[in-house]
């Protein structure tokens, strides 16, 4: 049986809804299964790792990845931490290291730090880290930190890194999409589910933007139907940045669904936008920053703070990575 790209994307969208629900059930509410609250003197992989901190006693917690589209190259990886009482663990920053688990000799290949970013609509949030993966396959993230009571904690999980991302790769050409503009519709509600849409976000198509010799910010989000309730705030941040970079950067908002006026509270009626499928969007919100030459500068899966986007826009304006 053959499946169209639309069928595949519809299946992926439903899967993401399930994953999103599981993520929030695990991360931000209590669950029936108790997480093991044990004292450990080394990590589960420490017997084969010379750099394990065997002298440090830490309690074991859970780490839940919030990023789906991971591939070789530069990545923005986000995750949540769940304490032994099923509550989210929030500290300013944690230490991270990454191991390639398919290697004959498993060792730490990347070390870094992840900072906590609060979401604007609730007490929820995620840790944000930057990592460059050079090999596809199974990787492990290990997280170490100190809680607000001064106690050490440790978490780890495995995940897959693809050889090619669903969305355009960094430094690759982006699709020259001809998304609907304000001039193409009778009412803004046809192309925006924002309660107070910034009309300037709907003046250009991506093709228009690529051809006008300015960097471009494109945010894919559906404020009215967003699973995480971060799409509205994300579009608002993009609108605010548009005002700060007026005349220097193009800004575009594109909805996830092409029939937002027909959904009427029933998400089963939603039809994925062909532009979303063209870009390989697998979650929302998703923000891209494009160079003047139409190559992708950076991308941000999930909610991204104003400061983080501001810094990225400033870099692309000044021809920096």
Region annotations inferred by a language model:
Residues 1-12:
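N-terminal secretory signal peptides that target proteins for export/translocation
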Residues 32-35:
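Bacterial signal peptide processing site
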Residues 37-188:
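Contiguous segments within soluble domain cores/interaction surfaces
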Residues 206-227:
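Short active-site neighborhood of thiol/selenol oxidoreductases, capturing the structured segment around
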Residues 228-245:
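Typically the conserved alpha-helix immediately C-terminal to a functionally engaged Cys/Sec
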Residues 256-284, 289-293, 314-315:
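Thioredoxin-like thiol-disulfide oxidoreductase module
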